[in-house]
């Protein structure tokens, strides 16, 4: 039964009472939330109550659920790359569904989101739906939601990228790139390394046997053996620092600081634009395509390429193996 208030407490919001040492808010779900001391002014109590109500509402919507997921052990077990991707996907999803109660989200709502988002990017729509499903799966296993609204909602069919970077294209961009982009291009190509793994590379990864790389996405650990060309790329990276600047980053700015993805991308795009102006060719490949070129150019079987690239399955390797195969023709005279 709701406690009656005296006349002098009539100014207080519903479910706010004087406790033994503080004003308290008793929400419908039970419990008591301490607002402020008993000597607080009326406006301070009202403000504390408003903040408490908003905090509770946030906990009860999808934004609150996603926030809890991001603080969970399951999320911390994911690779740093996946964590960053999920945070990026969450911004798009929560801009639409953030204030919705998790149990009120239905498959038809997810489908509508997919259709609208897919009009711009089917790939991103798929990734964002996969993130949302992962979040709901975590919540469902803990009794926080009644269902996963993503279950049964079809993803868009994706066409695997098949862009192969020709040697002359690589050379054209390389020759117009600044030293830090040149060094990153070579390390990525020679080691089949992702951009993120190259930019986060530190000097303690440079070993006697080669370059130690733990892939940010798969956590696979490898040491890429030295070749003369790879040593030359590392020597180029050493020249990036100026004066007595010391940096732990292999690919660093003149002041020793590491490059952000966006900062590095600007140098990459400038080099590609300069090469386009000279060659009058499209050069429509991305930095990530250099990893595919590396795997495609590596001589050997699919299993050999898998060992080289660090992929967990041969199917993943096939996605990156894009070089058109030269096969015998019929010789019938």
Task: Please report, for each region that a protein language model flagged, where it lies by residue.
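N-terminal DNA-binding module of tyrosine recombinases/phage integrases
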Residues: 5-6, 14-23, 27-108
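N-terminal core-binding DNA-recognition domain of tyrosine site-specific recombinases/integrases
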Residues: 73-144, 258-263, 284-286
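C-terminal catalytic core of tyrosine-transesterase DNA break-rejoin enzymes
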Residues: 123, 183-186, 190, 197, ...
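Basic, Lys/Arg- and aromatic-enriched nucleic-acid-binding interface segment
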Residues: 126, 141, 145, 151-195, ...
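Conserved tyrosine-mediated DNA breakage-rejoining catalytic core shared by Y-recombinases
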Residues: 160, 169-172, 191, 196-242
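DNA/chromatin major-groove-contacting recognition/catalytic segments
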Residues: 172, 222-238, 307, 315-333
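Short, polar N-cap/turn motifs at the start of nucleic acid-interacting alpha helices
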Residues: 205-208, 301-321
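Active-site/catalytic core of tyrosine-dependent DNA strand-transfer enzymes
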Residues: 227-281, 294
């Amino acid at each position: 039964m709701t406690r009656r208030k005296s006349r002098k407490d009539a100014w207080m919001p519903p479910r706010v009472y004087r406790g033994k040492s503080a004003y308290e808010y008793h929400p419908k779900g039970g419990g008591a939330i301490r607002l402020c001391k008993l000597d607080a002014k009326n406006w301070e109590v009202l403000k504390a109550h408003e903040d408490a109500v908003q905090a509770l509402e946030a906990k009860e919507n999808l934004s609150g659920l996603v926030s809890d997921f991001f603080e969970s052990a399951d999320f911390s077990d994911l690779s740093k790359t996946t964590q960053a991707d999920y945070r990026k996907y969450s911004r798009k999803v929560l801009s639409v569904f953030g204030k919705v109660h998790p149990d009120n989200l239905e498959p038809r709502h997810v489908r509508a989101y997919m259709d609208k988002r897919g009009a711009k990017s089917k790939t991103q729509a798929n990734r964002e739906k996969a993130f949302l499903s992962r979040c709901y799966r975590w919540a469902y296993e803990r009794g926080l939601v009644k269902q996963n609204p993503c279950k049964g909602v079809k993803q868009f069919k994706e066409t695997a990228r098949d862009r192969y970077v020709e040697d002359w294209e690589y050379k054209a961009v390389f020759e117009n790139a600044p030293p830090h982009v040149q060094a990153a291009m070579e390390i990525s190509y020679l080691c089949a390394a992702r951009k993120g793994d190259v930019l986060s590379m530190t000097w303690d990864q440079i070993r006697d046997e080669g370059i130690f790389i733990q892939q940010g996405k798969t956590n696979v650990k490898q040491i890429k053996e030295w070749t003369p060309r790879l040593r030359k790329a590392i020597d180029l990276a050493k020249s990036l620092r100026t004066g007595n600047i010391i940096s732990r980053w292999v690919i660093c700015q003149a002041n020793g600081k590491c490059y952000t993805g966006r900062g590095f991308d600007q140098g990459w795009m400038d080099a590609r634009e300069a090469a386009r102006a000279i060659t009058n060719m499209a050069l429509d490949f991305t930095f990530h395509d250099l990893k595919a070129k590396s795997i495609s150019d590596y001589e050997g079987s699919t299993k050999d390429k898998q060992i080289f690239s660090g992929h967990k399955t041969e199917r993943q390797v096939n996605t990156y193996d894009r070089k058109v195969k030269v096969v015998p023709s019929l010789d019938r005279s």
